[in-house]
Structures are given as C-alpha cells and as structure tokens.
Curated annotation (Swiss-Prot):
It comes from Arabidopsis thaliana (Mouse-ear cress). It is found in: Membrane. InterPro entries: BT1, MFS_trans_sf. It is a multi-pass membrane protein. One of its GO terms (cellular component) is plastid. The chain crosses the membrane at residues 46-66, 92-112, 117-137, 142-162, 186-206, 210-230, 264-285, 298-318, 328-348, 361-381, 396-416, 433-453. This is Probable folate-biopterin transporter 5. Keywords: Membrane, Transmembrane, Transmembrane helix, Transport. Could mediate folate transport. Belongs to the major facilitator superfamily. Folate-biopterin transporter (TC 2.A.71) family.
Length: 492
C-alpha cells in the first residue's frame, strides 16, 4: 500500500516536472532562437531588425494608420472612394524611393559609409514631415497628402537599408533565410499589436494630429540607429563604375526567367486583390446600419487582429518554412479569398441572424485574415531574398519590393474606382456588399498564374551561380554590423 502511494506521488511529481519543463520550453524557446540568430548573424543584426521593423514600422505604421484614417475622415472630410485613391498616392514613394535609395546604398557611400547616412537621413525626413502635419492648422488636403507621402518615403528609405542587411545575410546563410524573415515579421507583428492597441486611446486623448506628433519619436530612433551603426569606411570608390556594374548585374538578373516570372506573379496577386478597406472603415464607424464603433474600439479590434499576424509568423516558422513555394502560394491565395467572406457576412448583417454580435465576429475575422495575410507576406519575402544577386542586395530587393508595392498601389486605386462606380459614399453603403463580393472573386484569379512561381522548396531554391555573382562578392565591404553602445561611448 505504501509502495503504491509512493508510485502515485512519483507519477504526480513527474507530471509536475513535465509541466514545468513545457512552460520553461515555451519561455526559453524564443530566447534560445534569438541567441542562435545573434550568434550566427551577430547580435547587432537582431537589434537593428527590432528597432526598425518592430518600433518604427510595426508600432509607428499601425499607430499612424489609424490616425490617418480619422484625420482624413474627421479633419479633411473626404469621401471613402477619394480616400482610397489618395492612399494609393502615398505608396508612390515606396515604388520610386525604395529602388532609388536601394541602389544608392549599394553604390554611393556618403562620407565613406554605405548604410549609416541613409538611416540618419530617413529619420530626419520622417521627423520633419510629421511635425508639419501635427503643428499646422487648417492644412490643405493636398499639402497634407504631400507631407504624408514624404513621411512614407522616409520609412521606405529606412526599410530598404535594413532589407539590404537581411538580403545579404540570407545569401550568406541561406538556411537561415526563413528565420530572418520570421524575426522581421515577428518584430513587426508585435509592434503592430502594441500600436493598434494604443491607437484608439491616443486618438481619443490627443487627436489624430497629436498622434502624428508622437510618431516623430519612432523616426528619431531610426536616426539613432544610424549614429550607432558601424561599418568599414570605403576609400577611393568610383560611383560611375559601381553604378555601371550594378546596372549590368540588375539587367542580367531580371532577364532570368527564374526572376521575372515570380516577380510578375507577385504583381498580379497584389493588383487583383482589390483594396476597399477604407470603404469598410467608413461603414464600421459611420453607417447607421453598421456597428458604429468608437475610436477606442477600432484600435482594440485592430490590435486583436495583430495577434493573427503573430500566429501566422509562428505557424510559418514552425510548420511551413520547408514547403515548396508553389504549394504555399496556392493555399494562401485560396484562404485569402475565403477569408473575405467574413466581410461579406458582416456587411449583409448575416452574423446577427446567427446570434453572433458584431464585436465577436470582427475579432475572429481580424485574427484569421491577419494570419493569412502574414503567411502570404512571409512567403513573398523569403522568395524575394532568394532572387537577389550578391553585391546589389539592397538594390535588387528594393526593386522587387517596389514591384510588389506597385501591385498594392494598383489594388488601392482599382478599389477606390470600384467604390466610386458603385456609389459608396460617407452616407451611402447600399452597394458595399457587392464591392466585397467582387473583391473576393478577384482574389481567386491569381491562382491561374501559379505556373510563374518556381517549384523548388524554400531551402534549396537558388539562382544560377553566374546570376548570383558569387565569385565577385567582396566580404570586406559588406560587414553590416552595429557598433556596441559601449564602443560608441568609448569613441565619444
């Protein structure tokens, strides 16, 4: 009897130890993963990604997104179709400035440095542009749009600089390409979660213009990163020769069918996914037949949706990063189209007929949709890093992402045009359900172009050696490491 009681106690102790071990693995697993990346890629790369992708882009963009929505709706009083079209204009900076500064960071060092000055420049431009919006009263719509486009350009400059680091490391450590994109996306998603969570509260407390003023701190951080950035000084460079070599490498690469075909697919899949989110935003907040959400509620719902982004990153990193590109694009596109049915059910108010309140239904919709969108982005990012040759990583990755952003701009413009044709306005939403239905059907069309996507899996796919330019890689000029804070203080 005593032995049986002892066995029961031992089994109970084993279960307790197992639970503690599982809890420890949940907590320590991400820490070990970060340590692994820091040891193989240098801790400074991890710090750079968290600062730029997490704080400036994730937190800053999500906070600014909600502030811009209310600024356009309440301060500038624009129609949803007009706002949808105007939002496409701000994307122009990502199409023009990202490839432009991508090639400049590769071939034109400033004061002998390839990366530091561009981080500093991006931060200064972002701070100045947001200060103009936040401090000017009665700012004309198109002048406000101009400064928003400039701030978007500043974010694009910072983004292309960190992209160059990621792409270089992906070429140097191809087995870690998926992990690096997971780090970027996870940082962004966590920052996005915090930004959306605080957005509604801050807009309510200080107004949309006040939020623009607060966002200057995230751009100031970008300049700080530029000050701390350490890289070898370049001496005796030839801009003309570097530019000529970069153009030749780009032309040689873009002619490769393994490059232009997936690039075309990425543009098609973005352009055909009509963007009507501004029309839905007006319906959420202004329509008498809609939920009539307050500012705090909108921010909270968007923050809950960001949990879906984090789940998407975790799902990709744990289960999907070894699957073939074509298979992943197929399933993510199918799920992307199906997730749009949540919006259709909501606009038609079918959820109320099934006893599902708007709040609960939109939360579920946000989590599922964000998870699928993040999965799609992850696959696109990993594929883009695989398509970049050595020596012009920043240039070519920026070119590929500008193609992707051109697709998003086309999607936003076509979505605004559709809202205008269907007469969806600030007060009339009768045809919004039809716009949602058309958008969902259009999301299925890119599946017809899947033959453009390479069949290889994400770990083994690689461009030919003559395209990658592996023989001409210069490791000495690509040592992209951040100086430690201690070293910086010592130099000061």
């Amino acid at each position: 009897m005593a032995r049986e009681e002892q066995n029961i106690e031992n089994r109970g102790s084993v279960h307790v130890v197992e639970r503690e071990s599982n809890l420890r693995s949940v907590v320590c697993g991400p820490v070990r993963w970060l340590k692994m990346l820091a040891s193989k890629l240098h801790w400074s790369y991890v710090f750079a990604v968290v600062s730029n992708c997490g704080i400036n882009q994730g937190f800053g963009y999500s906070l600014g997104h909600v502030a811009t929505d209310y600024y356009m709706k309440d301060v500038q009083k624009v129609q949803p179709s007009q706002y949808q079209a105007l939002s496409a204009i701000t994307r122009i900076s990502w199409i023009i400035f990202k490839p432009l500064f991508g090639i400049l960071t590769d071939v034109l060092p400033i004061f002998g440095f390839h990366r530091r000055p561009y981080f500093i420049l991006a931060g200064v431009i972002g701070v100045v542009s947001l200060l103009f919006i936040s401090l000017q009263s009665n700012l004309h719509l198109y002048l406000a749009l101009f400064w928003m486009t400039i701030s978007s350009a500043a974010m694009a400059i910072a983004d292309v600089t960190i992209d160059a680091c990621t792409t270089y490391n992906s070429n140097k450590h191809p087995s870690l390409a998926s992990d690096m994109q997971s780090l970027c996306s996870l940082s962004y998603s966590i920052g996005e979660l915090l930004g959306f969570f605080m957005s509604g509260i801050l807009v309510h407390l200080v107004g949309s213009k006040g939020v623009f003023g607060l966002l200057t701190f995230t751009f100031a951080l970008v300049s700080v990163v530029g000050v701390l950035f350490s890289e070898p000084r370049v001496h005796g460079f030839s801009f003309k020769q570097n530019f000529t070599n970069a153009m030749k490498a780009m032309w040689r690469t873009i002619k490769c069918s393994d490059v232009w075909q997936p690039s075309l697919y990425m543009f098609i899949t973005r352009a055909l996914g009509l963007d009507i989110k501004e029309g839905l935003f007006y319906w959420f907040t202004d329509s008498k037949d809609g939920p009539l959400f307050a500012q705090e509620t909108v921010g909270f719902i968007l923050s809950i949706g960001s949990i879906g982004s984090i789940l998407g990153v975790l799902l990709y990193n744990l289960r999907l990063k070894d699957h073939p590109f074509r298979k992943l694009f197929l399933w993510t596109q199918l799920l992307f189209a199906l997730s749009g049915m949540f919006d259709l059910i909501l606009v038609l108010r079918l959820n109320l007929k099934f006893g599902l309140p708007d709040y609960l239904f939109i939360v579920v919709d946000g989590i599922v949709s964000k998870m699928i969108i993040r999965l799609t982005w992850m696959v696109i990012f990993v594929l883009n890093t695989k398509l970049c040759p050595h020596g012009i990583e920043g240039t070519f990755f920026a070119l590929l992402m500008s193609i992707d952003n051109a697709g998003l701009m086309t999607s936003s413009w076509l979505g605004g045009k559709m809202l205008h044709v269907l007469k969806v306005t600030r007060t009339e939403f009768g045809n919004l359900w039809l716009a949602v239905l058309v958008r969902n059907v259009m999301r299925l069309l890119p599946i017809c172009f899947l033959f453009l996507v390479p069949q290889g899996d994400q770990n083994t796919f690689k461009l030919p050696a003559e395209i990658m330019g592996e023989d001409s890689e210069e490791e000495g000029t690509r040592n992209l490491e951040l100086a430690s804070l201690v070293d910086y203080v010592d130099r000061s």
